[in-house]
Amino acid sequence: GQQDLADRCLVFLHRESVSDDPTRVIRASRYAARLGFVLSPEALQQVTATVRRWPWAWHWNDAPEQAPPALASRLRMELDRLFAVEPWAVALDCLEEWQAMALLDSSLQHDRDRNRRIAWAQRLGLPLLPAWLVVAPNPEAVARRLGVPGQQQQWLKQLLRLREWLLSVDVPDVHAAPDVWTAALETQGWMPETVAFMVCLQP
């Protein structure tokens, strides 16, 4: 109501708003970032309690393709808007504060390098959503559930193999000349975007 606007508070319409449609949490983070609003105490309690309770039929060990749209394609659409038009760092800070990262993957809840990594992706012209997801244990599965474009899914899938290769005995010495590294990367057939995401992961 008018008083909530005056208090710069975001309020859900009813007590089951989040369980009915979890995309409302992402939308709330967008409005909070853009307008400088905060969740009301009741709304915050609803978000944290609902995500902790996980009332939805789909669970993490289920096939990504079986997730309902509100935990999949519609969630991605809200995230696409978040990264395209909102102060994304503020919006993601809100989601972290609300303990809502588990809507994507619980590992994202404690991601201290998030803003630095996504800022690097922005500078390199990479899509920001997969740059956020790269630290998940299986980022390609999260991307598949969200319906991220297939080429971006391939980058994330290849990133897991690139990580393994970098830990193997077959990689050049860390102090090798750039042309040695370039030749090694090209020989392995890594896509340029995959290598760029790996660069974003470096401290």
PLM regions and their residue ranges:
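Histidine/acidic-rich helix-loop-helix segments that form or flank divalent-metal centers
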Residues: 109-120, 149-202
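Short, flexible beta-strand-to-coil junctions
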Residues: 135-138, 199-203
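Glycine- and charge-enriched loop/helix tracts that form the active or gating conduit
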Residues: 1-146
